[in-house]
Amino acid sequence: MKKTLEIKNLSYSFGDNHILKDINIYVKENEVVAIVGSSGVGKSTLFNLIAGVLKKQSGEITIDGSDDYIGKVAYMLQKDLLFEHKTIINNVILPLIIAKIDKKVELEEGRKILKQFNLEKYADKYPKQLSGGMRQRVALIRTYMFKRNIFLLDEAFSALDAITKKELHKWYLNLKKEFNLTTLLITHDIEEAIFLSDRIYILANKPGEIIKEIKIEINPNEDIDVQRLFYKKEILNIMNIE
C-alpha cells in the first residue's frame, strides 16, 4: 500500500524555542494513524506544518510522493466552525463554493452527499437545531467535500460526551471503509486513538520527538476490551503516566 503522507527529519523552531525535532512519520493510503502526547509537545504545530499554515524550516513533507504538499490536506479542528446563519446544505457545499462550482451543481452535490451520509433530512435545518454530535458529522462531511488526499483531525471528537463520541467513532470508521479515507489524527484520548487507529505515534519531550510507534492489531477471536486495555497500559507506561 502506497504512502499518502511521509515526513522525514522535520524540525521546527520559533525563535530560540525548539518545538519539534527530527520527526519521521508516514501514513499509508486508507490508514488511520494517531499522534498522542501531552499538551505542549508540538502536536498542533506538526499539523500546521503539514497543512501549510506554518512554513517548513527543515526536513521533508511529501503527499503521494510529491513535495508540493500545500493545499493537499483537509484540516478539521475540535470546534465545528459551522456558519450559524447558513443551512446545513449550504455549510456542506462551502468547499464547492470556494472552488467556484456552478450553483445548481453545488446544491445537487450537497444533497447527494448528505443522502450518502444518511443526513438528507437535515439539509434545510440550521446548525443551532442540531446536537453536538450531529454538528460534528456535518463538519466531517464538509471536510470530506474538499476532496483532499488526507484528513487531518485535530482533537475532532474531544468536545463530545462519551456516548456521542463512541457513536461518532463507529460512524467515522464506516466512512473510512466506504470512501477509502486516509487520516492522521491528534488526540489526547488514548482509548480513542486505540479504537480508531491502525498505528499510533507517541510524541514526547521538548522539543517534541517521536519516541515510539505502536501498531494496533486486534484479534476479533479474543477479548477485544482486554487487548485494548493492554495497548492503553503500554502507551501510558511509555508516556510515564500512571
Residue ranges and their predicted role:
Residues V36-S38:
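The feature captures the beta-strand-to-loop junction immediately N-terminal to the Walker
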Residues A51:
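Helix-to-loop junction immediately C-terminal to a conserved catalytic motif
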Residues G59-G71, E109:
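Conserved ABC transporter NBD signature motif
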Residues I89-I97, L107, K215:
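Short helical segment in ABC ATPase nucleotide-binding domains corresponding to the A-loop/adjacent helical element
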Residues I97, K104-Y122:
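Conserved ABC ATPase "signature" region
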Residues Y126-L130, M134:
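Conserved ABC ATPase signature
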Residues M145-N149:
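A short, proline-enriched helix->beta-strand linker immediately N-terminal to the Walker B motif
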